[in-house]
From Swiss-Prot:
This is Large ribosomal subunit protein uL23c. One of its GO terms (cellular component) is ribosome. One of its GO terms (biological process) is translation. It comes from the Eukaryota. The keyword Transmembrane helix does not apply. It comes from Marchantia polymorpha. The lineage of its organism: Eukaryota, Viridiplantae, Streptophyta, Embryophyta, Marchantiophyta. It holds the Pfam family Ribosomal_L23. PROSITE patterns: RIBOSOMAL_L23.
Length: 91
């Protein structure tokens, strides 16, 4: 399933990690229930809540052509206490 693109690591999301909340950029067509089921199956965790918002598109200019960046939806996923998601492997 290619709904979840990648985890997001910013100052805000690092603060949210302390509250057992994880942030992911997902496909714009995904909805909360799809992402909740996918996270629970893939990472074997219990999801309490899922919050989402759409990121604004940004203007990109290449030469004389003007376009826009690819839009994603950002999901903030809150897990039940005792569960965690390993964002990076220890290899």
């Amino acid at each position: 399933m290619n709904q979840v693109k990648y985890p997001v690591l910013t100052e805000k999301t690092i603060r949210l990690l302390e509250k057992n909340q994880y942030s992911f950029d997902v496909n714009i067509d995904s909805n909360k229930t799809q992402i909740k089921k996918w996270i629970e199956l893939f990472f074997n965790v219990k999801v309490i809540s899922v919050n989402s918002h759409r990121l604004p598109k940004k203007k990109k200019k290449i030469g004389t052509t003007t376009g826009y960046t690819v839009r994603y939806k950002r999901m903030i996923i809150k897990l039940q206490s005792g569960y965690s998601i390993p964002l990076f492997s220890n290899k």
